[in-house]
Amino acid sequence: RVPAYSPEAVAEHTMAMLLTINRKTHKAYNRVREQNFSLDGLLGYNLHGKTVGVIGTGKIGKAFINILHGFGCKVLAYD
């Protein structure tokens, strides 16, 4: 719970982490550092049309849901 901090910043960070997991950029970064440019196992998937569950619809949850809608995701929310 961080009521004094920017809900949008937290929601954007959450989306960045979701994209990192989705597109496997953390693995790609490590491979490039090892001079391995193979794409094996690095293909992610599109978020558009996927359903994402959000637990908590306070200020941060609402900001995150707005971002997800921008990516074309369907949202299931629980508060």
Question: Positions of the model-derived regions?
Answer:
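Phosphate/diphosphate ligand-binding glycine-rich loop within oxidoreductases
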Residues: 1-29, 41-44
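A short, charged, Gly/Pro-tolerant segment at domain boundaries
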Residues: 31-39
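Rossmann-like dinucleotide/phosphate-binding beta-alpha-beta segment
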Residues: 40-79
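Extended aliphatic helical segments
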Residues: 2, 10, 32, 52-54, ...
